[in-house]
Amino acid sequence: MDRLNQLSGQLKPNAKQSILQKNPDDVVIVAAYRTAIGKGFKGSFRNVHSEFILTEFLKEFIKKTNIDPSLIEDVAIGNVLNQAAGATEHRGACLAAGIPYTAAFIAVNRFCSSGLMAISDIANKIKTGEIECGLAGGAESMSTNYRDPRVAPRIDPHLADDAQMEKCLIPMGITNENVANQFNISRERQDEFAAKSYNKAAKAVASGAFKSEILPIRSIIRNSDGTEKEIIVDTDEGPREGVTAESLGKLRPAFDGTTTAGNASQVSDGAAAVLLMKRSLAEAKGYPIIGKYVLCSTAGVPPEIMGVGPAFAIPEVLKRTGLTVDDIDVFEINEAFAAQCLYSAEQVNVPEEKLNINGGAIALGHPLGETGARQYATIIPLLKPGQIGLTSMCIGSGMGSASILVRE
């Protein structure tokens, strides 16, 4: 009997083998694309709103994937800065792009993880049998909403002096200063990390590495004389060549500390989406399967050091999947700020060569609600079939999220 138990244990697949197995009820990724990311306030999307970006993008997404829109049963779009997370205008964008009204819609706002939460929402609906096909993504126009006073939270005066409430209202840049101070992350290290992000992204743009994940879309810019001009946006506007730690070191801190415009993520505009299906449906309809969604986990952390979120969310998703850091082939950890990304990656022992291979949000930009979906569009081309990827980000008010996917 002991011998039989030993043999049974040997035949049982380990966690990695189990995740790589293909089953009819898997949640698979049929497509993942994004727009080029526009610079906030002065880039190619500066004069259009998120619903315009999303409409134009979804039109191209449907055309590129040749998906039958009537198969889409639900759409989840992440957004942070629009009122009600874009619930009305982004539903309208879906309809304007050609998705039928029979597809339901949900607006998702969990700050910087909103795009990933949209993916998780659709994936979980497929897992539970609510739907068999859904579209998840994110869209953000920081150019039109970032400085809108209506975006600021309004707190009941009876709670205005509550210590815990106050922690949730700390500006993101100050929370990064807290991380840098508490964990001794110097300005020099932050600038070195940021320079590497710029250099990797600039190299990726120059080599055309992003072309497979970007769908060129139409935008409209307003000239100084009031006339409008139609343009095509197909290249990320944040990356630039020749950035060094020394050049970044000359920038003035945004606060009383080490955070600067050079070692923090850029204010940006853009959209991204992931088409998810039940494997059996994708196979029956003949759609290509480029990946498999595995799991997403979210962890809470102290709001005043919210940037450490990935250091807690990554171990959580690894524990729940039975994987180890060594099982992961590529990591995409959002670079909200250099200090928090550095800390999180080091706490989890992420090998530098596996982290943000083509740069991150410091160089590319961070359209808040779009980032989680953008990471999927970016990481999938970096993975070889059978490899495993992990995406993660910190979340304002004290959280972190992380997800696991497999390339097929």
Swiss-Prot record:
Pathway: Lipid metabolism; fatty acid metabolism. GO terms for cellular component: peroxisome. Keywords: Acyltransferase, Fatty acid metabolism, Lipid metabolism, Peroxisome, Transferase, Transit peptide. Its main location: other. GO terms for biological process: fatty acid beta-oxidation; phenylacetate catabolic process. One of its GO terms (molecular function) is acetyl-CoA C-acyltransferase activity. It is found in: Peroxisome. Belongs to the thiolase-like superfamily. Thiolase family. This is 3-ketoacyl-CoA thiolase B, peroxisomal. It comes from Candida tropicalis (Yeast). The lineage of its organism: Eukaryota, Fungi, Dikarya, Ascomycota, Saccharomycotina.
